[in-house]
């Protein structure tokens, strides 16, 4: 198949547009990712009040986390938030999807040092990067 220069330029423009659309995050999405990071850090430290405080910046998605009565409840709510976060972080530089093989749970973080939010201090190092963006 022979492509002329106009076709090649058009394909390049469409590809560039698709990449720029994927990379663009709204201010609301940026706020969500920042709050998710704060909740993550709090759960790593077994800090229920810190996780609940971060939930306020997660919008309606943070309601379950904000009402958590225990770390177990907070981690269950955080797992649901991680599904949305994986979608938001896809294609964003600096975000890494981690997986804990023991608990079979995923989360997103910006650090390349494993910080498992599901096992707290007891399992902080359990997990590995599944996908880097």
Where are these regions (language model features)?
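Bacterial N-terminal signal peptides that target proteins for export
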Residues: 2-11
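Bacterial N-terminal signal peptides
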Residues: 10-18
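Intrinsically disordered, low-complexity terminal tails/loops enriched in metal-binding residues
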Residues: 17-133
